[in-house]
Curated annotation (Swiss-Prot):
It comes from Bombus pensylvanicus (American bumblebee). This is Bombolitin-2. Mast cell degranulating peptide. Its mast cell degranulation activity may be related to the activation of G-protein coupled receptors in mast cells as well as interaction with other proteins located in cell endosomal membranes in the mast cells. Belongs to the MCD family. Bombolitin subfamily. The keyword Secreted applies. GO terms for cellular component: extracellular region.
């Protein structure tokens, strides 16, 4: 789902910070 993709992207970005 798009939501899962978005959450995964956000999680990756947050984890990168």
């Amino acid at each position: 789902s798009k939501i899962t993709d978005i959450l995964a992207k956000l999680g990756k970005v947050l984890a990168h910070v």
